[in-house]
């Protein structure tokens, strides 16, 4: 009897363990980056970025999901951000003659209702000590409104910039209620000396996917344990 009850308890413990949350990487691999000019690109590369800028640059319905880049004056002749698919990184070059450079991602989150948490993270390593770096994350609503989730700016001091942001419960709830699944991330560099490049790595948008509680199995094992204890008392 004791051995059987012990097995039941171990089974319950195992079921409880399977109810833990799982983390899923939602951001797609960096496969390429496309030059895409914008007439107010100077704001995209800096802290003055607006919802309208993101919507007009990345949000058009005909624009496919993926990574895009532009310079601060919208002219690709000055150069652009580049990607390294082997180590999944993006290089932001500082170039004379332009207000800056940025890289932006348009992506889709499927089944957002299944997630109990979302978090954005990245690591930026500069090669010099000039310029300013920014990042921002946004989502699109079914009504066509672009909503900011987070934004940050840092004056370059030559040290790495490690970013991590967890969406609040209110933000995630609003995304589930109003979002259309489209999410955008923009990373920019402005005001730097020519040749002072930055490397952006470990770009991530993780979702916490809650595993449903195996309630039926748990109740069944609890019922069996209770029945065996009752039979034991009757025999005693």
Please report, for each region that a protein language model flagged, where it lies by residue.
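N-terminal targeting leaders for non-cytosolic proteins
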Residues: 22-95
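Short, charged juxtamembrane terminal tails flanking transmembrane helices
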Residues: 232-236
């Amino acid at each position: 009897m004791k051995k059987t009850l012990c097995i039941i308890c171990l089974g319950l413990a195992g079921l409880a363990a399977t109810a833990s949350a799982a983390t899923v990487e939602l951001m797609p691999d960096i496969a390429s980056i496309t030059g895409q000019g914008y007439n107010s690109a100077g704001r995209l590369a800096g802290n003055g970025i607006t919802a309208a800028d993101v919507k007009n640059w990345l949000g058009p319905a005909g624009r496919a999901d993926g990574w895009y880049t532009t310079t601060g004056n919208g002219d690709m002749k000055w150069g652009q951000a580049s990607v390294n698919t082997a180590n999944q990184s993006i290089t932001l070059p500082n170039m004379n003659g332009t207000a800056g450079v940025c890289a932006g991602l348009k992506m889709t989150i499927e089944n957002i209702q299944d997630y109990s948490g979302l978090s954005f993270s990245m690591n930026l390593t500069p090669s010099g000590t000039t310029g300013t770096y920014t990042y921002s994350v946004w989502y699109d609503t079914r009504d066509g409104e672009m909503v900011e989730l987070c934004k940050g700016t840092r004056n370059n001091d030559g040290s790495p910039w490690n970013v991590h942001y967890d969406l609040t419960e209110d933000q995630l709830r609003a995304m589930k209620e109003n979002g259309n699944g489209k999410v955008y991330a923009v990373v920019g560099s402005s005001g730097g000396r020519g040749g002072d490049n930055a490397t952006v790595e470990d770009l991530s948008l993780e979702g916490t996917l809650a595993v449903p509680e195996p309630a039926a199995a748990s109740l069944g094992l609890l019922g069996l344990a209770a029945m065996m204890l009752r039979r034991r008392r009757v025999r005693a």
